[in-house]
């Protein structure tokens, strides 16, 4: 009955504050576990070494009590392993992983039209559907009653999306 929400560390306090605001009378607790757990990106090939079954979006497996899952937004982003902070180095060593500059991951993400960092400029100025959340399976059009649902549904229904974050490739 637990869920893990991954986000930029600098946004954690604000996200927990918003979630607590919107939970109303629900019997739900939001806890900051960023000092205990860490997420690391691994390649899809490494995921296939851990789990030999068919790879699909959101596929989850277990590696030494650490959940490992294919990024549900886009399979080209690879997979992630979530580990206790004190155990991550052991997992990295046993999986024979290499450290790579996180800019490489963010660049790949941006190439796929998946914004991840420094979105402060867009705060309160863009709907989730304009931020590609529908493409990333982050909006459920069958579920009602969520913040912004009326506008998001209207945009989708009328096919009136006027702006969207898109990847741009520079040709030299």
Regions found by a protein language model. Name each.
Residues 1-172:
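Basic, glycine/lysine-rich polyanion-binding surfaces/domains
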């Amino acid at each position: 009955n637990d869920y893990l929400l991954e986000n930029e560390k600098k946004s954690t306090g604000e996200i927990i504050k918003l979630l607590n605001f919107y939970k109303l009378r629900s019997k739900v607790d939001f806890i900051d576990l960023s000092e205990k757990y860490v997420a690391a990106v691994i390649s899809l090939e490494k995921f296939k070494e851990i789990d030999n079954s068919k790879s699909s979006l959101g596929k989850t497996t277990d590696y030494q009590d650490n959940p490992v899952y294919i990024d549900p937004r886009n399979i080209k982003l690879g997979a992630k392993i979530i580990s206790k902070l004190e155990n991550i180095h052991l997992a990295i060593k046993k999986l024979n992983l290499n450290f790579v500059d996180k800019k490489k991951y963010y660049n790949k993400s941006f190439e796929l039209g998946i914004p991840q960092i420094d979105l402060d400029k867009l705060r309160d100025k863009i709907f989730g559907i304009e931020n590609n959340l529908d493409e990333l399976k982050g909006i459920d059009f069958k579920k009602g009653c969520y913040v912004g649902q009326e506008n998001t549904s209207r945009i989708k229904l009328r096919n009136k999306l006027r702006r969207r974050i898109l990847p741009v490739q520079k040709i030299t």
